[in-house]
């Protein structure tokens, strides 16, 4: 897995776009691998969330019509499609995973690593995608 850059400034930027005061409590951990961001558009942001506070997190997702996917589903997909080459480089599998909109109901070209859940927040459009590189834990 590639290294992750830490930047608390981005956390504040993202939170400022969210419509609920509870967002800072419900979204505790962001994990976005920098390689995943090369496929994002200005209107796409996918956030990988830890599953530590799943009850509040999924309730927030439901209220805000946010699409999610759990890490078990991703792991099963990767293992089912794993080849000898992919054992040393899972990048191909992640690309294929996010091309398949029918299975996962996602609108993404992004590669996201070590994921737990994914948010698609359409309102975040003014952020420079090169700045959206972070891994923040409360």
Swiss-Prot record:
It comes from the Viruses. It comes from Invertebrate iridescent virus 6 (IIV-6). This is Uncharacterized protein 426R.
